From Swiss-Prot:
Coiled coil: none annotated. This is Methionyl-tRNA formyltransferase. Attaches a formyl group to the free amino group of methionyl-tRNA(fMet). The formyl group appears to play a dual role in the initiator identity of N-formylmethionyl-tRNA by promoting its recognition by IF2 and preventing the misappropriation of this tRNA by the elongation apparatus. NCBIfam families: fmt. GO terms for cellular component: cytosol. The keyword Transferase applies. PROSITE patterns: GART (PS00373). Its EC number is 2.1.2.9. It comes from Caldanaerobacter subterraneus subsp. tengcongensis (strain DSM 15242 / JCM 11007 / NBRC 100824 / MB4). (6S)-5,6,7,8-tetrahydrofolate binds at S110, L111, L112, P113. Belongs to the Fmt family. CDD domains: FMT_core_Met-tRNA-FMT_N, Met_tRNA_FMT_C. One of its GO terms (molecular function) is methionyl-tRNA formyltransferase activity.
Length: 309
């Protein structure tokens, strides 16, 4: 089967690897343009491009996929039977969606129609879901609205964060893609329409979302910490300095102190929330490294009764 693969970040790498391992004819890889990163503004390639170059596969990096006749012509000349899309990062126009014989198949990191959009992994954790999964679907003009092909679920563990769940789903995505393509070749797939009335959305994550509102229940703040790790991270302010909180656990507390109050700070750090409290386990002060809370408290004094902002 002749395939063009479209993807950009780490999430897409296991799916592309699986195509190579299973001997598919990967005609080309389409990925986002190179970016300049770091203080030296060095050009860095996307993880998908790195893998494609290792395998000697043609790489296409259009600035835009819409109103781009040159790119469209390149795709037509490649003549793929199917286009596989995994976290590519751009919306495809209809002339690309209808080009391959079998259409464009997307590997999406949620159990559609729940969590359509850019950040399904983060939002599943933020919202306290107990399971999520992978859906492969036939792409249409909408945002993750196409007919579903296969679904596989996975439990969200209590200690999962967005990074650990991302890695699990990236690997599961490769498995589900493999099964989808096999069944596609055998004519054994029956596309299933999504129930739009059951749809929920997973909008893009912003840095501002990480600012902790201590009036929220402790369980909700803990889910936010997990859902925004490693980027952008959750933070609060003490004495004008940002404190990033990377790990915490809920503790029962029925006092009436103001939310954000430091309840204990001798050898552990417990902060009052709108409901219950949080025991902070990993912290990072602005300009410093991440550390366990005991190590942090040896060198930093946060008096009990202090209110974190």
């Amino acid at each position: 089967m002749r395939i063009v693969f479209m993807g950009t970040p780490e999430f897409a790498v296991p799916s592309l690897k699986r195509l190579f391992e299973e001997g598919y004819d990967v005609l080309a890889v389409v990925t986002q343009p190179d970016k300049q990163r770091g203080r030296g503004m060095k050009v860095s390639f996307s993880p998908v491009k790195e893998l494609a170059l290792q395998k000697g596969v043609k790489v296409l990096q259009p600035e835009s996929v819409k109103n781009n006749p040159e790119f469209l012509q390149e795709l037509k000349e490649l003549n793929p039977e199917v286009i596989v899309v995994a976290a590519y990062g751009k919306i495809l126009p209809e002339e690309i969606l209808t080009l391959p014989e079998y259409g464009c198949i997307n590997v999406h990191a949620s159990l559609l129609p729940k969590y359509r959009g850019a950040a399904p992994i983060n939002w599943a954790i933020i919202n306290g879901e107990k399971e999520t999964g992978i859906t492969t679907m036939l792409m249409d003009k909408g945002l993750d609205t196409g007919d579903m092909l296969l679904k596989r679920s996975i439990a969200i563990e209590e200690d999962d964060d967005a990074q650990t769940l991302h890695d699990k789903l990236a690997n599961l995505g490769a498995e589900v893609l493999s099964e989808t393509l096999k069944k596609l070749k055998e004519g054994k797939l029956i596309p299933e329409k999504q129930k739009d009335e059951e749809a929920t959305y997973a909008p893009i994550i912003t840095k501002e979302m990480g600012h902790i509102d201590w009036k929220s229940p402790a369980c909700r703040i803990r889910n936010l910490i997990r859902g925004l790790k490693p980027w952008p991270g959750c933070y609060t302010f003490y004495d004008g300095k940002m404190l990033k909180i990377w790990k915490a656990e809920v503790v029962e507390h029925f006092g009436n102190e103001p939310p954000g109050s430091v309840l204990k700070s001798k050898d552990e750090l417990i902060v009052k929330c709108g409901e219950n409290a949080l025991r902070i386990l990993e912290i990072q002060q602005e300009g410093s490294r991440k550390m366990g809370i005991r190590e942090y408290l040896i060198g930093h004094n946060i008096p009990e009764g202090t209110i974190l902002k």
